[in-house]
Amino acid sequence: MYRRLKLVSVEKRTTTATVDGKENVINLCSNDYLGLSHNQNILKRAIISLKQISQCSSRLIAGNDPKLINLEEKLAEHCETESTLVYPTGYMANLGVITTLADKNTTILSDELNHASIVDGCRLSGANIQVFRHNDMEQLEHLFEAISCWRKKIVVTEGLFSMDGDISNLQQICRIAKEQNAITAVDDAHGDFIFGEASASSSSRFSGIPSYLGVNNDIDVHTSSLSKGLGCFGGYVASTRQIRELLINKSRHFIYTSALPEHLCVSALTAIPIATKGNLQKKLFDNIDFMFRKLSQLGLRLAGKSGSSQIIPVIIGDEKTAIEFSKRLLDNGIFVQAVRYPTVKKGSARLRISLTARHGRNQLSSAIDSFGTVGKKLIII
């Protein structure tokens, strides 16, 4: 039952991969939701930038490349915030901002299904941590009442939850946090550039779940990733200029690490206007609706609501059965990883499907057929 690293080589400009030597496998594990890692214009710009010499330094020494500043300005426009700060990864962005804003005199209220980077940031901060049941606003209010004597309070959640594919109850969280004079922090790595207002200005279109739910201005701290909606690499924090300056001077996860290389900044800068056009999101949600409907018709137990997001968890329950299901799918040319404890709760092992805008209908139909075949053999259906 120990985890094992599979050897995965993604095929060029396709949604297939070679997995442990098995070729032409349909890849349903990628977080490249809009398929931009294959975009030729982005790749050409990155290749040109690779000819430049990287500073190979932290930003406070010699690594503050002009392209990083350009990227941060574009991301601030995208999020409609005063400023942003780019980190090497989304994981480090969460650790950096939480450990900077919270200390032993702070209480953090955290959704029980928050990502490991949020959990780790909370623990490292030394704050008093109160965990509330997933999206349970009644319990969140009760916890706030119990900690009313604490001066500094932060409520942190994901926008789109990475293992369940459902959306945070951000409207209620923002209301409660405002009443309690608490900071609201949202990690929207999986919703950024996928969800949002399609009618917004070009720079802020698809700026994530907060925008989608109409509470963007009520969020104090946004964190996100450049490796999902943009298909690039890196992470960032979007907030006020004051918080940006605080992070530059206090965040160990920013100060003591090398800066994001120029070619990755150029890739993200090139990807932003492509990602915000809207045509790729339409293709993605067409695939989501089709996949969710067909899997439901098979009788599989799916988490989340119909067509709610690009993350579709097929709940198996038993860990060994989930691992065997994944193995048999791979034998059938379908790559879907089994996710189990401690990533998810015991007894809730699942197959986590990640859809992209590049998946063809024939590929999805083939995957659905394989789910049906394997599900019947394992008596899941």
Predicted regions and their residues:
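N-terminal "arm"/small-domain region of PLP-dependent enzymes with the aminotransferase-like
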Residues: M1-I53, A182
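Active-site phosphate-binding strand-loop segment of PLP-dependent enzymes
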Residues: D32, Q130, H134-V186
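Conserved PLP-anchoring active-site segment centered on the Schiff-base-forming lysine
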Residues: V97-A116
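Structural motif of enzymes handling amino- and sulfur-group chemistry
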Residues: A259-T276, N287, S296
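Active-site PLP attachment segment
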Residues: E197, S202, S211-L246
